[in-house]
Structure formats: C-alpha cells, structure tokens
C-alpha cells in the first residue's frame, strides 16, 4: 500500500480551495402580501427603487410604483390569475424599459415590446434599451420649431400648421374625426419615406377595442403606411397598468429615432383613457385623490410625457451632452432630430373646460378643436377654426403656403360672424355678399374626404384660387368638382409648377399660370 505524503494532501486541498469562486450571486427576494385589481404589495424588498422591474416566480413582470415603510406597491404587467399570497418576487435591478430597433417598423407591439400581431417574434438581437420614463431634454439641447410637418389636410396645413418637434392637441367629442386627422397625417408621410427622408410614425392605442386597433392597422397597410409605422397597443382588455405605460413606451420608441438625428411622429390616442387608467391604479394603491378623484400629480403625468417631444439642437457637440441620456445611446447621438406629438383628448358634450382637457391644452403648443355640429353638417374635418390654434404658426410653414394662406384664418372667422348676422337681415351690400360667397366657397374647398391627404404644392395652388376669389363664377355646390378638374389640369400639364410650389417658391409667372388654368376651368361653369 502506497503511503500518502502529507505535503501532497495539503497541495490538493490548496488547489481545490483556490478554484472555488469567491463571487456569490445574491438575489434580493420578497414575498407577496396581497394582490388585487392588477396591484400587488410585496414585503421584504427594502432596496427596491421607484420604476424598477420586479419578476414573480411564475415569470410575470411588475413595476414598482409605491415605496412604503413596510412594503412595496407594484403594478402588474400581466394577469393576476397565477399570483398568490406568499409567492416569491425578486428584484431585477433594471428600471422599466423597452428594447427598440428598426425591426419594430411595420409591427404591432404591446407596451413592453412584445409582438401581438401574430407575425412571430421581433428580432431584437441588436437593440437599444430605452427607459419608459425619462427626463425631457433641457432648454440648451432644444431648438425652435421651424420645419413643417405636412399633414396633407388643407385646413390644418394652411391655418393651424404643425412643425417638427411641436405638441399639437387634437380635441373633440367622440365620433368627430379625431383619429382620422392623426391617421391621415401618418398616411401623408408616405411620400417623404419614398424620397428617403422618412418621418417614422408611432401610433399608441390606449384602452381601445382590439377590433378598432385591428381595423386601423388594416387601413395603414392598405395605404402603404406600415413600413414606417409602429403601433403600440394597450387594448381595453389589458390591465390598467399597461394602458398607463403605453404612451411612455411610444415616447421611448420616438426618442430612439429622435436622438439618432431622425424625425418621428407619435400619436397618443387618447390621453383621457390614460388618465382614467392612472386614476384606477392610484386609487388601488391608496394614493390620496384630488379633483374628479384623479391623483394630485395627473398634470405632471401628462406634462412629463409631452415635454419629451422636442426639436433637438443641430450642433453635434451640444446634442451629445443631452441630459438623462440612456447608456445605450452614449456616443451614438446625432443632432437635428425631432419628435412631434399629437395627443388626442376626448371631451364630454363639447366641454373643453373640464379638468383633463384644460391640463393638456395648457401643456401643448396649440390645439385642433373638432365640433360635432360641423361634423353633422358635413364639414369634414370638422375643425372649429375660431378656437383652434397653433402657437408655432407661420414658422412651421413653407414660404408659398404662408404667402397664400396668411389671411385665410381671419377671413373664415369673419365669414362665420357675418353668416350668423346675415340670417337676420334680408338685404345686404355688395361687399358683404361677396365676403359671404367667398367664405362659403372656401369652406367647401377645406372639406376633404378621409384617407386622401393632398401634397402641399397642390394645396397652395387650390388655396391661391380660393383666397383670391378666382372661384367666383362657380356655384357653391360645384366647388369641389371644379377643384378636382383644376388639379387634374395642373398635374397633367404643369407638374413643374406644383413641384415648385411644394418647394416653397411662388412668383408672378407661377401665379399667372394658376390664374390662366382656373379661368379656363371656372369658365365652364358660367
């Protein structure tokens, strides 16, 4: 029998001790105290942070919202059915975020980035982890809004222009065409996408029926708008937490494009439902309620979301220093990008002075107000020009449009006043009669059918005729027919004129061409 040397034993023991890793993987784990209505209270997570992601043992994720003395209140991003009292919950040490890359374009996702369109998983191998909640860019990193965002809607582009980086509220009662304006704007970006100057669109559906979202996606597909669009959907059947976080997911995706020097448009449809979801979550978390039972910080909820829309400074060295930049974007930031927001608010019986509508009006850079009465009279889009406004104004218009449509808003407001008085008087002077006639005809010109956005060059040509009274020989009921004939001639015989107008140039030779064509077309109606 061989003798074992003591020195060999000590060497073997020493080798084994050295091979043991000293690193230990600690996980902070808590237990579920209570769970109800999409909210769970967890005991034991003493170091949990606000907005941190938590993972339950069955794989369900949750986000920390309340930090209390003895427990943590969190909202569940899934069903509560598999979660029981005493179940273990662990910290992920990650702030709530969404993974984003270009493969998301053309897809329908939920607020945590999972595909819900049945087209398989999205390849997120090379993706950016964008935080859902993030501070808005500071004043130094912004620039004044000066580039137009063309909606293709005559009434908007001429009288309530929207610029890249602006927040323009769309407000009105149900069934007045709010979503239609947003969808038309998305469809109108197709020409820019084809020219290689895309405006990426994010449509956020909050608390809508799944069938409504499916119909909208189908509409976007039919008009070729999905290749540059991402739809984020938290439907009515999803938990309140999902509806609450959906707009933040949309903003995070928009920031991914904005901070890389690209242009993005995000539509929140609609923020009234997000406020209701936030109220629901807050009341279950036992937060003190305020006016209309909304929590006291409901204004801050919308302001911090909408302030994330911005036109970023074009100077590269300034843009790179942007505040609260996610780690994944450091060194990849490009200046000059923009994120435009079109929040939608639903009013009850035209009451614009309610709590949430007044909050959002005070945050945004203007509003497009839609009226049921105008909609029912057949004026669509049913925009009330009198109280709709864009606080960016002419700086978000091309020069030709600014020149042609400069007085259109005032003219239409005056026409509305005169029309109200004309109902009471039988005789009127020639000037008043002419103003009323021109107003009625311009009203007809501004009517536009859904899903048919008009290129800006064609808009300028039509509005030049309208504001200069060149449709005078045409009866009011034939105005739209005459407009279509006029545009047909312009497209076939003078495409260069329309192209030049679209580039913002207008001179005497161009106006002479327009006047000649409209005289020939309008002459047929004498």
Regions found by a protein language model. Give the residues of each.
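Phosphate-interacting basic helix/loop segments used at nucleotide- and nucleic-acid interfaces
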Residues: 12-20, 92, 151-156, 250, ...
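P-loop NTPase nucleotide-binding/switch module
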Residues: 87-89, 96, 100-103, 116-166, ...
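Conserved catalytic/coupling modules of large nucleotide/cofactor-utilizing molecular machines
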Residues: 256, 273, 280-526
């Amino acid at each position: 029998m061989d003798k074992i040397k003591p020195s060999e034993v000590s060497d073997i023991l020493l080798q084994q001790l050295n091979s043991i890793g000293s690193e230990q993987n600690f996980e902070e784990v808590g237990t579920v105290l209570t769970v109800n209505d999409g909210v769970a209270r967890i005991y034991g997570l003493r170091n949990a942070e606000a907005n941190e992601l938590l993972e339950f043992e069955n794989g369900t994720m949750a986000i920390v919202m309340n930090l209390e003395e003895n427990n943590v209140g969190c909202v569940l991003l899934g069903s509560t059915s598999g979660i029981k009292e005493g179940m273990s919950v662990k910290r992920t040490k990650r702030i709530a975020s969404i993974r984003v890359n270009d493969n998301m374009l053309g897809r329908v996702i939920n607020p945590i980035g999972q595909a819900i369109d049945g087209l398989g998983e999205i390849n997120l191998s090379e993706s950016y982890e964008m935080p859902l909640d993030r501070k808005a860019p500071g004043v130094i990193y912004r620039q004044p809004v000066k580039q137009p965002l063309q909606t293709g809607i005559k009434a908007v582009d001429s009288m309530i222009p929207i610029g890249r980086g602006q927040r323009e509220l769309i407000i009105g009662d149900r069934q007045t065409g709010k979503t239609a304006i947003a969808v038309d704007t998305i469809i109108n970006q197709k020409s820019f996408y084809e020219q290689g100057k895309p405006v990426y669109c994010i449509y956020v559906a909050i608390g809508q029926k799944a069938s409504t979202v499916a119909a909208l996606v189908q509409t976007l597909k039919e008009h070729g708008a999905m290749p540059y669009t991402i739809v984020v959907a938290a439907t009515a059947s999803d938990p309140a937490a999902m509806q609450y976080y959906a707009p933040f997911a949309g903003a995070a995706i928009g920031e991914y494009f904005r901070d890389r020097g690209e242009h993005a448009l995000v539509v929140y449809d609609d923020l009234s439902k997000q406020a209701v979801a936030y109220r629901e979550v807050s009341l279950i978390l036992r937060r003190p309620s305020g006016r209309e039972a909304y929590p006291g910080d409901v204004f801050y909820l919308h302001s911090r979301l909408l302030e994330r829309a911005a036109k970023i400074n074009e100077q590269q060295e300034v843009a790179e220093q942007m505040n609260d930049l996610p780690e994944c974007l450091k060194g990849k930031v490009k200046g000059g990008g923009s994120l435009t927001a079109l929040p939608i608010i639903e009013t009850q019986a035209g009451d614009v002075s309610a709590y949430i509508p007044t909050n959002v009006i005070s945050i945004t850079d203007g509003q497009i107000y839609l009226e049921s009465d105008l909609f029912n009279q057949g004026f669509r889009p049913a925009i009330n020009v009198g109280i709709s406004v864009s606080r960016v104004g002419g700086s978000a218009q091309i020069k030709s449009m600014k020149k042609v449509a400069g007085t259109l808003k005032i003219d239409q407001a005056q026409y509305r006043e005169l029309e109200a008085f004309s109902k009471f008087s039988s005789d009127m002077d020639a000037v008043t009669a002419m103003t009323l006639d021109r107003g009625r005809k311009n009203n007809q010109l501004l009517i536009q059918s859904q899903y048919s956005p008009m290129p800006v060059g064609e808009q300028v040509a039509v509005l030049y005729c309208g504001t200069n009274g060149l449709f005078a020989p045409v009866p009011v009921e034939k105005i739209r027919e005459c407009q279509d004939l006029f545009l047909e001639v312009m497209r076939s015989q003078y495409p260069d004129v329309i192209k030049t107008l679209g580039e913002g140039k207008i001179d005497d030779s161009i106006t002479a061409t327009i006047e000649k064509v409209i005289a020939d077309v309008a002459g047929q109606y004498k």
